[in-house]
């Protein structure tokens, strides 16, 4: 039970930070746009939904590794990630270019990791 509570707490903090990025920062949604930003070196952090197709996930992780960009595996699916972004559609891949007022990039390294 303690582990479930901890994951819920971290999920809420990620969601609140995401909302702040949506209001005050710069970001791109979607696989193609995210890949483009990673290749250009503009992406600071990439967030992937947990039901992102394996080939896409591995390709983004590979390009992010080359560009030394952080990759965060969001614990919810693409519908939940879209809702967390305040959108009414599914979001599988999200790249943060400028976090704005949010401290999402500083707070992610302890949660970021390969799965």
Swiss-Prot record:
Cell compartments where the protein resides: Cytoplasm
GO molecular function: RNA binding; structural constituent of ribosome
SUPFAM superfamilies for this protein: L30e-like
Phosphoprotein among keywords: yes
Annotated positions of the N6-acetyllysine modification: 26
Covalent cross-link site, Glycyl lysine isopeptide (Lys-Gly) (interchain with G-Cter in SUMO2): 26
Any GO BP annotation: defense response to Gram-negative bacterium
Modified residues (Phosphoserine): 10, 16
The keyword Acetylation is annotated on this UniProt entry: yes
Keyword annotations: Acetylation, Cytoplasm, Isopeptide bond, Phosphoprotein, Ribonucleoprotein, Ribosomal protein, Ubl conjugation
PROSITE patterns, A to Z: RIBOSOMAL_L30E_1 (PS00709), RIBOSOMAL_L30E_2 (PS00993)
One term under GO cellular component: nucleus
Disulfide bond positions: none
Major localisation: cytoplasm
Quaternary context: Component of the large ribosomal subunit.
Function: Component of the large ribosomal subunit. The ribosome is a large ribonucleoprotein complex responsible for the synthesis of proteins in the cell.
The family this protein is said to belong to: Belongs to the eukaryotic ribosomal protein eL30 family.
NCBIfam families, per database record: PRK01018.1
Name of protein: Large ribosomal subunit protein eL30
Gene that specifies this protein: RPL30
């Amino acid at each position: 039970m303690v582990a479930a509570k901890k994951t819920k707490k971290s999920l809420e903090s990620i969601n609140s930070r995401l909302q702040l990025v949506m209001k005050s920062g710069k970001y791109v949604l979607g696989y193609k746009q995210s890949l483009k930003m990673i290749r250009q070196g503009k992406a600071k952090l990439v967030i992937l939904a947990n039901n992102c197709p394996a080939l896409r996930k591995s390709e983004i992780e590979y390009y992010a590794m080359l560009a030394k960009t952080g990759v965060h595996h969001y614990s919810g699916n693409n519908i939940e990630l879209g809702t967390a972004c305040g959108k009414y559609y599914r979001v599988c891949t999200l790249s943060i270019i400028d976090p704005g007022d949010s401290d999402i990039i500083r707070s992610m390294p302890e949660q970021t990791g390969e799965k």
